[in-house]
From Swiss-Prot:
GO terms for biological process: NAD biosynthetic process. This is Probable nicotinate-nucleotide adenylyltransferase. Keywords: ATP-binding, NAD, Nucleotide-binding, Nucleotidyltransferase, Pyridine nucleotide biosynthesis, Transferase. It comes from the Bacteria. Pathway: Cofactor biosynthesis; NAD(+) biosynthesis; deamido-NAD(+) from nicotinate D-ribonucleotide: step 1/1. It comes from Aeromonas hydrophila subsp. hydrophila (strain ATCC 7966 / DSM 30187 / BCRC 13018 / CCUG 14551 / JCM 1027 / KCTC 2358 / NCIMB 9240 / NCTC 8049). The gene is nadD. InterPro entries: Cyt_trans-like, NadD/NMNAT, Rossmann-like_a/b/a_fold. HAMAP family: NaMN_adenylyltr. Belongs to the NadD family.
């Protein structure tokens, strides 16, 4: 008998904002996830180094998790001195949680770029992929991704509960068009970030003087 599935959401979280949290909340509720683990990256392999320190980003993620029932912080990637490869994290989690389906949460942009990920063909050997989509948007899938969807896409939530891994679920989320880059630019102007990130995170950013021009 398998345990209820859990969600895995990795990211730089520089800072964490509603573009990260809202799809994760919807996945938690729609898919019946027992918890959502937030994993801040230490060395993100696909983007520039973070603006804030690991300690500051971890503090913001912890504040965001405290405001959302079922959300917890997983620090394992911050403790590594190597790039934060998703496959390494999923392998570790699978060993720790052999009877728990793992649902790796990602955006559509990440799915479209999946063939550039380290050992991407192995991800479904350890987890399901839960992909946030935009209502009415028909993406132009690369051939490798289209083939992956043809073999692994599921139409039944129950599949994510009865199988440990191997399915892809396209989640029809409310659109949230916000990136950390745009948010940092807004914060640099001193504008009010209300409703764009959790109140406790906004307060922390103000107290620490983060994202202000040098």
């Amino acid at each position: 008998m398998l345990k209820p599935p859990i969600g895995i959401l990795g990211g730089t979280f520089d800072p964490i904002h509603i573009g990260h949290l809202r799809p994760a909340i919807e996945a938690r509720d729609a898919l019946g996830l027992a918890e959502v683990r937030l994993l801040p990256n230490h060395i993100p392999p696909h983007r520039a180094s973070p603006f804030c320190s690991s300690e500051q980003r971890l503090a913001m993620v912890a504040l965001a998790a405290a405001e959302n029932p079922g959300f917890v912080v997983d620090e394992r990637e911050l403790k590594r001195d190597t790039p934060s490869w998703t496959i390494d994290t999923l392998i570790e989690l699978r060993h720790e949680l052999p009877d728990t389906p793992l649902c790796f949460l990602m955006g559509m942009d990440s799915l479209l770029g999946l063939p550039s990920w380290h050992r991407w063909q192995e991800l479904l050997d350890y987890a399901h992929l839960v992909v946030s989509t935009r209502p009415g948007w028909q993406p132009d899938y690369p051939a490798e991704v289209a083939e992956l969807l043809a073999r692994h896409q599921s139409q039944q939530v129950a599949d994510l509960h009865r199988l440990r891994h191997g399915r892809i679920w396209l989640a029809d989320n409310l659109p949230v068009e916000l990136s950390a880059t745009r948010l940092r630019a807004l914060l640099a102007t001193g504008a009010d970030p209300r409703y764009l990130l959790p109140p406790s995170v906004a307060q922390y950013i103000r107290q620490q003087g983060l994202y202000r021009p040098a």
